[in-house]
Regions:
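Glycine-rich phosphate-binding P-loop
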Residues: 240-268
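N-terminal accessory targeting/assembly segments
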Residues: 1-185, 190-194, 205
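Post-Walker A helix-loop "phosphate-sensing" segment adjacent to the P-loop in P-loop NTPases
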Residues: 269-280
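Phosphate-binding/switch loop-helix module in NTP-utilizing enzymes
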Residues: 320-354
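Conserved P-loop NTPase nucleotide-binding/switch module
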Residues: 340-388, 400-401
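Long, charge-dense accessory insertions within large macromolecular proteins
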Residues: 164-220, 291, 297, 316-320, ...
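N-terminal pre-Walker A segment at the start of P-loop NTPase domains
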Residues: 206-241, 284-289, 293, 298-300, ...
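Flexible beta-alpha connector loops of hexameric P-loop NTPases
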Residues: 298, 308-329, 361-376
Length: 402
């Protein structure tokens, strides 16, 4: 392992050379209270940026041990640290000049969900963060002076402000960790109370726009119907109330623009924990939930869709069905069967994105097309059996089909 001064000398020695000379920098360098590892060097300044990582020992980082004692706490802490690092590097990205991607400093972007990511990991040795740096060049000539700024001026500031407990807002981090524990508690309560989902009173479900996952300003907070309102005593937040959706078959109905799909979309993402301030912090759904839709044109390989589709005109065997170009109904049937194979216990469906002929056949169409002429058994005829025989619940948005 080399020290930081040896890296500085290497930078001076390759300055103004051809860009491939940067590859000599690959290796691990000691920067006092952290290790800098240059893992992959880009081929030229216009290629995907170089891969760099930093390792900080637990002794130096000094986070309380309970913050990384199990998978939930490690995932939550890593998510928090990644967001802090993303915020810090955004102040310095492209401040080092050059051509192409020169000066870029970036890490995997975190959206509103708290997820396990390879960008930041915690093990028994310490914290590892992986990110990208555009090594600077003028044309295809190395500009080591600018890379020196990144590695010796910008990066130490970002690391210090992001990965050392003494540099962070301890109360803010504690609130972040406690929220995750409250969310995990609700996940556990769902099974104990025979529920498949929970939506807290006061939740903000609408999003800012179709391309933004941030909460919509001035939106109406969720208010549970009295018939479904329950209360929970959380470990940290205390008592909260909201709508508990029981296992079984649940219909979400209402007029247009009344939030049916918005509620279903929130339930879809309720399998993940959300960050404070998202509005959906206490929208919690069964971890096995799957959002299903028609996927016309998809590939299907050896799936038994005979539960829904039989006696196709071309004599194709639906017990082991394959196609390169599925129809709307066969694609949705395959999606349901695949979800059953994956042990899903909750299906989420919206009639707007479903194949109508797969979902329902009204009385008029049953008279027009006799049952022996129709290969499709509608989902609504199977929904009760799915719950009673396989324990699979359904939440369905309906606005036009009875």
């Amino acid at each position: 392992m080399n020290n930081s001064e040896e890296l500085r000398q290497q930078l001076h020695s390759i300055n103004r050379k051809s860009y491939p000379a940067y590859k000599a920098l690959k290796g691990v360098y000691h920067f006092g209270n952290y290790l800098l590892s240059i893992d992959h060097v880009q081929g030229d300044p216009f290629a995907s940026p170089s891969h760099v990582s930093v390792q900080i020992s637990h002794t130096d980082a000094r986070f309380p041990k309970e913050y990384y004692k199990n998978f939930l706490s490690r995932t939550t802490l890593c998510d928090y640290l990644t967001r802090q690092f993303e915020k810090q590097v955004s102040h310095f990205s492209f401040r080092a000049k050059g051509s192409g991607k020169s000066g870029l400093i970036t890490v995997s972007h975190c959206d509103q969900e708290i997820l396990s990511r390879t960008a930041c990991e915690i093990n028994e040795k310490g914290i590892t963060v992986r990110f990208f740096v555009g090594f600077p060049a003028n044309g295809r000539t190395i500009n080591a002076t600018e890379l020196e700024k990144i590695l010796f001026d910008f990066l130490p500031v970002c690391v210090r402000k992001s990965f050392f407990y003494c540099s962070l807002d301890a109360q803010n981090l504690l609130n972040y960790m406690q929220l995750a524990e409250d969310q995990e508690f609700i996940h556990h309560e769902l099974s104990c109370r025979n529920l498949c989902a929970f939506v807290a009173d006061g939740a903000i479900l609408p999003r800012e726009s179709g391309i933004s996952s941030h909460p919509m300003k001035d939106s109406i907070p969720f208010n549970s119907p009295e018939s479904l309102r329950i209360s929970m005593e959380l470990p940290h937040q205390g008592t909260i109330t909201g709508m508990g959706i029981p296992k079984g078959i649940t219909l979400i109905v209402g007029g247009g623009y009344h939030g049916k799909s918005t509620l279903l979309n929130a339930l879809e993402l309720g399998v993940y924990n959300h960050i404070p301030g998202d509005g959906r912090e206490y929208v919690i759904t069964d971890n096995t939930a799957v959002k299903l839709r028609s996927e016309e044109g998809r590939f299907i390989k050896d799936v038994d869709i005979s539960l829904f589709i039989n006696d196709l005109p071309n004599k194709k065997d639906t017990h082991c069905f394959s196609t390169l170009d599925a129809s709307g109904s066969t694609s949705q049937a395959a999606g349901i069967v695949e979800s059953m194979e994956a042990k899903s216990q909750l299906f989420l469906l919206d009639e707007d994105t479903s194949a109508t002929n797969f979902m329902v056949r009204d009385a008029f169409m049953q008279q027009v097309i006799q049952r022996d002429k129709e290969p499709i058994t509608p989902f609504l005829e199977r929904a009760r059996d799915l719950y009673e025989k396989a324990g699979i619940s359904t939440i369905l948005v309906a606005g036009s089909s009875g």
